[in-house]
């Protein structure tokens, strides 16, 4: 549950 996780910001976010 890391808000800075690349899978969260650079994954589905794109």
Swiss-Prot record:
Sorted UniProt keywords: Amidation, Neuropeptide, Secreted
Tissue-specific expression: Expressed in the brain, subesophageal ganglion and in the retrocerebral complex (mainly corpora allata).
Gene Ontology CC: extracellular region
Transmembrane domains' residue ranges: none
InterPro entries per the UniProt record, alphabetical: Pyrokinin_CS
Residue list for modification Leucine amide: 14
BP term (GO), one: neuropeptide signaling pathway
Annotated localization: Secreted
Any GO molecular function: neuropeptide hormone activity
Chief localization: secreted
Translocase in keyword set: no
Similarity-based family: Belongs to the pyrokinin family.
Function: Myoactive.
Protein's UniProt name: Pyrokinin-6
């Amino acid at each position: 549950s890391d808000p800075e996780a690349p899978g969260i910001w650079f994954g589905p976010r794109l």
